[in-house]
């Protein structure tokens, strides 16, 4: 996916969306990039991405997590490297089935950084819907 930059010295320049992430990580490394907020519940999810160090549950109430641009980019890079290490290459399709959460975008960008195609599925889909959509992807 390519976007047109708006404003500043980059006006009119076309660059991949992953380059925006890398640019923001360089220019605004310590500024907040993503916020996850749910004031009514604590983090009780169990997810399989923990082995890659992408999940960092908190015990704060109200529940709020945030990550900076540099952390966002680092997590996307780590996930991309994991995928490449498992044989994912440009043009491959990678399904993403997970809850809406702070880790969703670093994982999505990690897929894009490999050159693969991200295929997000709604986590509410049943197995038949997942199979049907996977066949269409």
Which residues fall in each region the model found?
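Active-site charged/polar residues at nucleotide-handling catalytic sites that mediate phosphoryl
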Residues: 135-137
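Conserved AMP-binding/adenylate-forming core of the ANL superfamily
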Residues: 13, 33-101, 105-109, 126-131
């Amino acid at each position: 996916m390519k976007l047109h930059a708006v404003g500043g010295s980059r006006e009119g320049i076309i660059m991949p969306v992953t380059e925006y992430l890398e640019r923001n990580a360089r220019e605004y490394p310590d500024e907040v990039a993503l916020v996850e907020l749910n004031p009514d519940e604590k983090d009780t999810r169990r997810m399989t991405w923990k082995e890659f160090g992408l999940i960092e549950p908190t015990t704060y109430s109200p529940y709020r997590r945030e990550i900076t641009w540099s952390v966002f980019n680092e997590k996307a890079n780590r996930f991309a490297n994991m995928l490449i290490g498992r044989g994912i290459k440009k043009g491959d399709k990678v399904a993403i089935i997970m809850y809406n959460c702070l880790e969703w975008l670093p994982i999505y960008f990690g897929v894009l950084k490999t050159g693969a195609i991200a295929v997000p599925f709604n986590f509410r889909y049943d197995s038949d819907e997942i199979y049907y959509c996977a066949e269409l992807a």
